[in-house]
């Protein structure tokens, strides 16, 4: 939900491209939630919803990317460990592997954005997100 809210904040600030990127990311995440829920049900598991840890919303786009990158790094590391434990369940492994690839792509985008900001400056980069 955070990505959707952040996207709406960025759009309201006039950064339409950046806002859409995070709203689209939220929608992708919901697609993954559906796939994992379906798999849990297929395996006879019980679906639970546990509230997510609260995260502050950040109005500065660059600061948000930096904070999100740290969360992405930890998440990708965790997904690698999860993949290792799923080697005997090829169907779930394939879903997790595809999810990991999607999350890595997001991580690389964040890293690339921060590298670009370093090269051309924050104001110039923000202008590209209008």
Which sequence ranges carry the predicted segments?
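Iron-associated oxidoreductase/ferritin-like identity signal
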Residues: 1-130
